[in-house]
């Protein structure tokens, strides 16, 4: 299974729904996620049998808060996988996860990014055991469904300088 992600600082916008209805309050409209110019989503292939995406409600009466969690494993204790563990350790990320029903779930947003809460690598104690790198990312927000596809998440247009006063307007004027 392939997960897509980007640093929260790579996004130009992620517009969360403002609807009141149950379903509509959790669907991000197509076109409401945009990367900054020159940025793109990265992908990582995860071990299919051991991944999960969940949402929990924690707290006490009148103090409930939502928390979402993504757990997955990468096969092999390799320099690439260990590098992914160390590079994402303190970075705020936004993940895009396709489920078996064809929905694209969004974990994290501009206000509440997903952070690594648990990560460990093991070579396995016995020869037959898998060597894996385990990850758990959490965000203090609910999960949102993206109404578009992952391929439709584009980047903002390059900002061009327009007009005669875009550069050097303080030079060359005589009064």
Model-identified regions with their sequence ranges:
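Short, conserved charged micro-motifs
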Residues: 79-86, 146-148
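Short, acidic/charged, Gly/Pro-enriched secondary-structure junctions
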Residues: 83-108
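Short, hydrophobic/proline-enriched secondary-structure or compact coil segments at domain edges
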Residues: 3-6, 70-73, 91-100
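Mixed-charge, glycine-accented linear interaction segment located at domain edges/termini
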Residues: 112-175
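A general structural signal for short secondary-structure junctions and capping/turn motifs
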Residues: 61-62, 85-87, 96-97, 125-129
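Solvent-exposed edge beta-strands and adjacent loop segments
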Residues: 1-69, 113-127
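Oligomerization/assembly interface segments of phage tail-like spikes and tubes
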Residues: 58-80, 129-143
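Short acidic, glycine/tyrosine-flanked loop/strand segments centered on an H-E-D-like triad
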Residues: 71-74, 100-120
């Amino acid at each position: 299974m392939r997960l897509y992600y980007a640093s929260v600082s790579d996004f130009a916008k992620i517009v969360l729904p403002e609807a009141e209805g149950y379903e509509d309050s959790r669907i991000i409209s197509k076109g409401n996620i945009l990367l900054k110019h020159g940025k793109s989503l990265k992908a990582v292939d995860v071990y299919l049998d051991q991944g999960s995406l969940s949402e929990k409600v924690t707290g006490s009466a009148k103090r409930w808060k939502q928390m979402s969690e993504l757990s997955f494993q990468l096969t092999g204790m390799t320099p690439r996988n260990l590098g992914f563990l160390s590079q994402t350790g303190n970075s705020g990320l936004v993940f895009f996860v396709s489920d078996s029903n064809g929905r694209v779930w969004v974990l994290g947003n501009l206000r509440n990014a997903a952070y690594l809460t648990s990560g460990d690598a093991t070579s396995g104690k016995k020869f037959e055991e898998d060597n894996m790198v385990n990850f758990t990312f959490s965000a203090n927000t609910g999960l949102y469904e993206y109404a578009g596809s992952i391929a439709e998440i584009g980047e903002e247009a390059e900002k061009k300088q327009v007009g005669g006063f875009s550069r050097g307007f303080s030079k060359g004027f005589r009064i």
